[in-house]
Amino acid sequence: MDTKAFKRSLHKSEQYHRKGFGHEEEVTNLLQSEYNSKLIQQIRNNGYRLQQGDVTIHLAEAFGFCWGVERAIALAYETRRQFPQERIWITNEIIHNPSVNKNLRDMKVEFIPVQPDGQKDFTVVGQNDVVILPAFGASVQEMQLLHDKGCTIMDTTCPWVSKVWTSVEKHKKGSYTSIIHGKYKHEETIATSSFAGTYLVLLNLEEAEYVADYILNPGDTPSEREQRRADFMAKFANAHSPGFDPETDLERVGIANQTTMLKGETEQIGKLFERTVMRKYGPAQVNEHFLSFNTICDATQERQDAIFQLVDEPLDLMVVIGGFNSSNTTHLQEISIDKNIPSYHIDSVDRIGPGNRVEHKPLNADLTVTDNWLPNGPLAIGVTSGASTPDKVVSDIVEKIFSIKSASAEVVGVR
């Protein structure tokens, strides 16, 4: 499919929208009342620190809602106001935050049902319905299906995600295989790969090193090459385009990324493949075999930079707040753990209690319960949150921490 031509056609359709409907002031006021926090603003104004009793909160200087998330939520709220009686669907969670998605459900925004085989059931969508595409975007196949149905589409895709789509389309035009640094099951990567031609999704630097080694050492004999190819295909069974052949499709590669991945790792992967093609084809041929554009999201970079700064503080523990399926939140937790700071990833204040107990998600593990997670005595606690987390959620958790440590330290009347 010529995805670029399809996007141009879709954007010209009267049924397609990616801007608001004139309800900005009303929606802005509503979002501020639902998601903002006077306490968090107070902490910002106080140099990102607040002490109550023997607890000092150190807040990251960049955290919480990014511009793309705020925009997506605002457009979803505007859509409901513009179409008060119509049936409204959304193809996925608008963002990875349970409270925001619950609010949309309360507004009678329905989620496209998922069948037992994992495929979405779009037969429920009627011609007169409205469908919201979330901040992560949607695959080009889903967009075409909805366009063909003739339903109204509100596209809240983050512009940074759209920028990555443009990059992989350039890879496709130049006959480069898109090496996508991301999680192959993540909604954003699914959407991005649908705009690519030939692609391979790599989770981390370790997988990238495996691929780089294959490029340089595919095997010396036919049997070795056959075995190495079979091992490669088994390792990346669910992470490549149909018909992908590592023997031919890794001769020309372009780098792209899921916007929420670790910035430093994406850069390392890009440099690794640049060095790899230089070794294989020579310095003069690098541009014939390697292509890279800067597709690292500013907001992701800012939040990662802020927690790198925060973990240099003498902290006793870190609280990382965000949806458990939020990629950018998970990476914030990784940074804290790499600094050997005890880290608790929670998605809401309801995970805390009763008493000095917390239900949290360790990195790459299931939910677990830890008792006495807040030690006695003075505590310096780092707090950050993913790009999909409202200030109000952070505020509730900070207040809960204060109340556990000392009843006299409860923050009264500041919200």
UniProtKB/Swiss-Prot annotation:
Question: Which GO MF terms are attached to this record?
Answer: 4 iron, 4 sulfur cluster binding; 4-hydroxy-3-methylbut-2-enyl diphosphate reductase activity; metal ion binding
* Entry EC no(s): 1.17.7.4
Quick check: keyword Iron-sulfur in the entry? yes
The residues that hold (2E)-4-hydroxy-3-methylbut-2-enyl diphosphate are: H96, H186, T259, S326, S327, N328, S388
Matching InterPro entries, A to Z?
A: LytB/IspH
Q: Where does [4Fe-4S] cluster bind?
A: C66, C158, C297
Q: Which gene encodes it?
A: ispH
> Which terms does the UniProt entry file under GO BP?
dimethylallyl diphosphate biosynthetic process; isopentenyl diphosphate biosynthetic process, methylerythritol 4-phosphate pathway; terpenoid biosynthetic process
Tell me the protein family, please.
Answer: Belongs to the IspH family.
Pathway assignment reads: Isoprenoid biosynthesis; dimethylallyl diphosphate biosynthesis; dimethylallyl diphosphate from (2E)-4-hydroxy-3-methylbutenyl diphosphate: step 1/1; Isoprenoid biosynthesis; isopentenyl diphosphate biosynthesis via DXP pathway; isopentenyl diphosphate from 1-deoxy-D-xylulose 5-phosphate: step 6/6
Tell me which cofactor or cofactors this protein depends on: [4Fe-4S] cluster
Q: Which residues are involved in binding dimethylallyl diphosphate?
A: H96, H186, S326, S327, N328, S388
Q: Give the record's keywords alphabetically.
A: 4Fe-4S, Iron, Iron-sulfur, Isoprene biosynthesis, Metal-binding, Oxidoreductase
Q: What is this protein called?
A: 4-hydroxy-3-methylbut-2-enyl diphosphate reductase
Per UniProt, the cofactor note for this protein states: Binds 1 [4Fe-4S] cluster per subunit.
> Organism, per UniProt?
Acaryochloris marina (strain MBIC 11017)
